[in-house]
Regions:
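Chalcogenol-based redox active-site neighborhoods
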Residues: 2-161
């Protein structure tokens, strides 16, 4: 069962099993839910590589990466951008974590991170910037349905501590 947050965004409830996934990262490695079991996992959904808000959010996770790792968690970013875009984004900003290629946005849909958005009076469907923390058993431990890109990495680190 899903709950609704915000206008129409269906979110996975706390303590529910995370939806399964198996996606390639920027280097072609397959990352799956099964491969992440046994440790805490931060999954953040973002609209697009190398755009202002997405860059600030990624750099916030980068700047807090050592603390998040020391807290026993893995960070994973997810967008529909391709491998080349993800590699360049990670290289340009020295991102030390995997960026998954969600071609077709199925993972975003499964996690409730896809929905209606509007910009400049135009309504469209897209990735909604949101974050999940999964516990070592693959269950939802925390959800942020809306995030502040500049400080979200430190917010996640504070929660993990």
């Amino acid at each position: 069962m899903r709950c609704l947050q915000g206008d129409e965004m269906p979110l996975l409830p706390i303590d529910s099993p995370a939806p399964d996934f198996a996606l390639k990262d920027q280097f072609g490695n397959v990352v799956s839910l099964a491969s992440l079991l046994g440790s805490w996992t931060v999954i953040y959904f973002y609209p697009r590589d190398d755009t202002p808000g997405c860059t600030r959010e990624a750099c916030s996770f980068r700047d807090n990466f050592a603390g998040i790792r020391d807290a026993g968690a893995t960070v994973i970013g997810v967008s529909a951008d391709g491998a080349e875009s993800h590699r360049e984004f990670a290289r340009k900003y020295k991102l030390p974590f995997s960026l998954l290629i969600d071609e077709g946005n199925q993972m975003a849909r499964d996690y409730g991170a896809w929905g209606p958005k509007s910009m400049y009076g135009r309504t469209y469907e897209g990735i909604i910037r949101s974050t999940y923390i999964l516990d070592p058993g693959g269950r939802v431990a925390k959800v942020w349905p809306k995030v502040k890109p500049d400080s979200h990495g430190s917010q996640v680190l504070d929660w993990l501590r």
